Amino acid sequence: DPYLEDEGTIWLIHWLLASNSKLATSIFWFFNNFHKQEFTQDEALLSLVDFVSQDISKPVSGNTLKQDIGVLLRMYGRSTSGNKGIVEEALDSPLVLLQLVSSSTTGKAYKSSPTDRKNLPIEIFGYALVELMNSLDLNQIPINELMNTEDNTVAIGTSFRLTEDALISKLE
């Protein structure tokens, strides 16, 4: 799918980013460790700073983390700039189609809430499940560990922002 015409390809790209703590730390953190459903950019930044200070041995600039949050929100959230300004700044990322992050009704906050994600192809969900189990070297995994993570590992439920019912439905 060289032109990203299949929504499944975009879901796969999201999974590859959200499950990679080494190369996509901010995205991994957001989808696996940040569980606040409505938040401001500043709240997200404070949480990321806390996560990085606990998990990364090298010091990271606050400006770098602020830029990371801005990039993440632009990658996953629909542009609000309308037709003003530079055309490239008004273009949305393909990841916006997944509707994993949206602006709140006030416009000053963001939302990232679990839903049923009917547009998540079962093939991508299955691939993510097999990859997770292979990476953990497991033949079985409890549903609660698929839903949430407590030890900075990947959780399919939070990575795809699924409700518990949606996760169980996809497993069936």
Stretches with model-predicted labels:
Residues 1-172:
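Donor-sugar nucleotide-binding helix/loop cap in glycosyltransferases
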